[in-house]
């Protein structure tokens, strides 16, 4: 079993020869003069799965709910496990289900998962838990970090690759999907919301994940944010935008299917996406459509 890693573990047992807490990071605890193996910076995926909303099941969080015969969090982990460019994965979980997630990871044989980290009450606490662990491993500031919502099970490989590639030119990037709806910015007027402005639609996007950063950039942004008593970010990109305003954040194309499963009403859509990703199911659906076309054509021929 993967043991749950804590910052204390890493302080007491610093990484050696590329081995860190949990199963061991591929990053090295670099001293002066040392270099990364094969001169490559690590590319680390952080899967945030510490939320514990009970709208699905009072005993289990939604990331453990099955979609297409597989727990939601497993879909998310697999997206990075199957990407050859990802070197390491950290999974941040709620302590109440860490044993269950541990077992799921072991059963699936996810080889890139190096540690399971206890998350916090808020999303920001979970991100900070992962960043603190990475600091203790001695990960270089130039490492590429992709932070992903564990309840976005259908992130596409092209979006992951787009994040990794964008960090060659920028220090921050986020997957986002162009809005097809007109977006309204509002303000309060008495007890009502009223329209303040209407941004041009070509400039409006819906933020998704992963959100990607050079390690030094996201750490610096959070350090600056920590000094702000009004610090209440909704995602990691917001931290960079607010506290490193001169740091451009690149947009990486997302997709309609990269949905965040939030309520039970999202489940039918998620199940449909899961079915479409099953090659056998897709083949059967194509065959059924073909039969329907022939049946319709045959019916029309005999009705003349």
List each language-model region with its residue ranges.
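N-terminal glycine-rich phosphate-binding loop and ensuing alpha1 helix
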Residues: 37-100
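Short phosphate-binding loop-to-helix
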Residues: 106-143, 237
């Amino acid at each position: 079993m993967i043991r749950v890693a804590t910052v204390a573990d890493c302080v007491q047992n610093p990484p050696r020869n590329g081995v860190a807490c949990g199963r061991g990071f591929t990053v090295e605890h670099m001293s002066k003069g040392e270099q990364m193996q094969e001169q490559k910076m690590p590319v680390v995926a952080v899967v945030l799965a510490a939320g514990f909303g009970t709208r699905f099941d009072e005993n289990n969080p939604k990331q453990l709910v099955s979609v297409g015969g597989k727990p939601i969090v497993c879909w998310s982990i697999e997206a990075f496990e199957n990407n050859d460019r990802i070197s390491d994965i950290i999974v941040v979980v709620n302590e109440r289900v860490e044993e269950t997630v541990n077992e799921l990871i072991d059963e699936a044989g996810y080889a890139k998962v190096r540690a399971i980290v206890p998350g916090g009450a808020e999303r920001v606490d979970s991100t900070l838990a992962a960043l603190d662990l990475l600091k203790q491993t001695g990960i270089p500031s130039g490492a590429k970090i992709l932070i992903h919502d564990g309840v976005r099970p259908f992130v596409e490989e092209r979006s992951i690759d787009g994040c990794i590639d964008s960090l060659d030119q920028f220090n921050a990037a986020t997957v986002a999907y162009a809005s097809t709806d007109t977006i309204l910015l509002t303000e309060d007027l008495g007890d009502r919301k009223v329209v303040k402005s209407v941004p041009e639609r070509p400039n409006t996007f819906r933020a998704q994940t992963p959100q990607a950063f050079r390690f030094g950039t996201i750490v610096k942004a959070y350090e600056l944010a920590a000094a702000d008593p009004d610090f209440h970010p909704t995602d990691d990109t917001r931290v960079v935008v607010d506290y490193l305003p001169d740091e451009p954040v690149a947009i990486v194309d997302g997709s309609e299917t990269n949905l965040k499963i939030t309520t039970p009403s999202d489940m039918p859509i998620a199940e449909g996406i899961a079915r479409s990703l099953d090659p056998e199911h897709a083949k059967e659906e194509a065959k059924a459509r073909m039969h329907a076309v022939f049946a319709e054509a045959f019916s029309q021929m005999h009705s003349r």
